[in-house]
Amino acid sequence: MKLTRKQWMMLVVLVLGAFVTVLNQTLVTPALPSIMTEMNVDQSTAQWLTTGFTLVNAIMIPITAFLQDRFSTRKLFVFSMSLFAVGTLLAAVGLNFPVLLGGRLVQAAGAGILMPVTMTVLMLVFPVDRRGSAMGIFGLVIAFAPAIGPTVAGFVIDQADWHILFYLIFALSIVIIVPSLFLVDNKAPANKGDSVLDPLSLALSTLGFGLMLYGFSALGSAGFTLVPLLTTALGIVGVVWFFIRQTRLPRPMLRVDVLKNRRFLVGTIIGMLVQGALLAAGILMPIYVQSLHGLSATVSGLVLMPGAILMGIMNPLAGK
């Protein structure tokens, strides 16, 4: 069964939405040295632009299951893209670090909803015999975004200003939102009641991981002083409490029982270590290239490009 013209147009809108959100994640790292200089913040503070984004993004993913059970696909897609656009504009006009960070966190909330919703629409709307092709195009574009993001960002920073990056992303977001109002299929919410949002679990995961992340970050700059140690300890307690609570809820926010599978647990730990190393390299490499070697932002972007290209090539191969 061939895809209709409307389905192709909808696929383009969905893929572009995901592409912009993934591209946005890779644009910030080459801009970190410029942001640190302009806003007079140190490395441990500036890294919150990436780690904070990742944290909020991860927290929003389980919440999305609850939202999908209650709102239609078009409403969620438009809402998430609009939220992402608002955060992008806030970051673009931010003249101080708190405003910039706030914009990034709002961006992350929108992106955290958008990706699962996009996957759901692809699975619900496209026929079974064409679903593989749609997912393949989606995966290819998502792999392409990190490959060009740092280089594009470096070029823009050298030629203009890092604020322009967010204005460009904002413009692309608006271009995607307008046609999505007409092209994205408005599938009704499931209303199964399978997804339950436990307020305490949400609070524990947000505060636990947030405090732990802040504590580890502060330890790097302030050393083993009272505040970093206390926030780290409180964060660890919150995370442990969160996991214990998930084992006792009949319908948990996060199914932690899958970690009883030894292979899954080992794979998860390896994935965490790899992602941690990649995130650290993405933050430190532009600072190392630009601040210590005095090279341009474009060069720092080019340094990150080969790794991103190889990841894009190896991801589909690893799946086989």
Regions found by a protein language model. Name each.
Residues 1-3:
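Short, Lys/Arg-rich, polar N-terminal cytosolic tail immediately upstream
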Residues 7-23, 28-32, 39-56, 63-65, ...:
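12-transmembrane solute porter fold
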Residues 19, 38, 89-92, 128, ...:
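Histidine kinase transmitter module recognition
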Residues 19, 55, 89-90, 105, ...:
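Hydrophobic residues within the alpha-helical transmembrane core of Major Facilitator Superfamily
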Residues 32-35, 121-122, 156, 184, ...:
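Hydrophobic alpha-helical interface/terminus motif in multipass membrane transporters
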Residues 54, 61, 65-200:
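Helix-loop-helix hairpins in multi-pass membrane proteins, especially solute transporters
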Residues 158-269, 303:
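Hydrophobic transmembrane-helix bundles of small-molecule transporters
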